[in-house]
Structure formats: structure tokens, C-alpha cells
From Swiss-Prot:
Comp. bias intervals (Polar residues): 34-53
Stated name of the protein: Cell division protein SepF
Compartment(s) of residence: Cytoplasm
Complex and partners: Homodimer. Interacts with FtsZ.
Function: Cell division protein that is part of the divisome complex and is recruited early to the Z-ring. Probably stimulates Z-ring formation, perhaps through the cross-linking of FtsZ protofilaments. Its function overlaps with FtsA.
Highest taxon above the source species: Bacteria
Native source organism of the sequence: Streptococcus pneumoniae (strain P1031)
One Pfam family here: SepF
Amino acid sequence: MSLKDRFDRFIDYFTEDEDSSLPYEKRDEPVFTPVNSSQEPALPMNQPSQSVGTKENNITRLHARQQELANQSQRATDKVIIDVRYPRKYEDATEIVDLLAGNESILIDFQYMTEVQARRCLDYLDGACHVLAGNLKKVASTMYLLTPVNVIVNVEDIRLPDEDQQGEFGFDMKRNRVR
């Protein structure tokens, strides 16, 4: 062999990624056998675990959690606790949503917030209420009752003395209609 042939083979050794002359080797794949209901299926160690972050799975887990909380609260109906919150800034809304996610009822009084901040906070709470299947009811001019899915609220339809708005939420933007 000449020096040039050796040099070419040396270069080919490092430049080729795949040798097409070798036959394809099939890897051993794990074989799953039927498992009794009392046993848990064992995952093979060589397969990477797949994280399932799909929207449907999250919704299913959320619905299951809500059902679990509803069943749990039906069993323990000794006392009902309603937390009263006076948010002073928009960032306090996340704490209120955490309480709702923990299956607690919250009475919210927006008297220490400006109207713009209260409207923004109320929009956030309303969105969280829909996601967690809760209820948001206006009980006074600046007070709202936020309850989880398993709590039923019966509010008498009364008119407050200073209430001139027709909507359910007092912090909605007022629009002047031109006729």
C-alpha cells in the first residue's frame, strides 16, 4: 500500500459517520406482558421518562382535583370558614386565588383600592374563578364573595342605596350610549 492510500483511509475513517457496508442491527426492545390489576406496570430503565404537559391532561387533573375537593368537603361539613381579605394592591390577588385553589371561601372588600386597580384585580379573580370552576358574587358595593365549586351562595336581590349600575360587577367600565 502506498502512503497516499493509507492517508486516504485515515481521513475516511474520521469523515464518515456511518458505514453502509455493515448490516442493520435491531436493538432489543422491551416486551410488555399483561399485568394483573394488583401489580403496577414496570417501566424499562433504558427508556427516558416522557413528561406529559398536554392541555387535556392538565384539565383532566384539574377536574379530578376539583372533584376530590368537593367530595372531601362533603364529608367534613363541621364548620365553614370564610376568609375576609382587604387587598391593597393588584399583587394581593394571587394570594386570594391560592386560597380559592385550596377550596376556601373568600370575602373580598376592595375599599382600600382605587377603582382602576379594583377593576383589574376583579378581572384577574374572575378569570381564575372560571378556571377553578368557582363562583364570584357581588354582595355589596365594594365586596365580593369568591367561593369554590362545592359552595352554593344564595344572595337576595336587593338594591343598595348608592348603586346605580345595572351590571353584575360594580367595577365595570361605564359606557355612554348614544341614541
